[in-house]
Amino acid sequence: MNKISFVIGINNGLRVGDLLKLKVSDVERLKPGQTMTIREGKTGKENILMINKAVHKAIKNFLEEMQPESDEFLFASQKGRDALTIQAVNAMIKRWAKAINLRENYGAHTLRKTFGYIQRTKFGVGFEVLAKRYNHSSPAVTMRYLGITSDEINECLMNEI
């Protein structure tokens, strides 16, 4: 359970509250490259869940190991058939962070922010693209959301053209 929630969250940048609504039947037949349309709870806007190879592998492994029923929530509570709550995911992520001695305040929203940070710093994805992905009103909102540091600005100013 832990791995699938991490892999889907870190690879899609969706809000955890939207991921928690997923049922096994929503994803069990999806292949890499396929998408599923979701409606964001916060904004009411449509967005997509992308199945990349890592997400597909995590889903496949989870389904083989846990053998959930198609009508169950993908992220089910251990106390019945209800979906996990955002509070439960927050607690889970805080436990993960503590287990590896991370001292900052991590929670459910960390997966969404980390997606953007990695896309920007490792893959060079621009704020315009990330703003579209996040359904933000502008790249400026995304820049504030991801937190541009003065060190990054100074580093940019040191680039010689």
Tell me the role of every PLM-derived stretch.
Residues 1-161:
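Conserved catalytic core of the tyrosine transesterase superfamily
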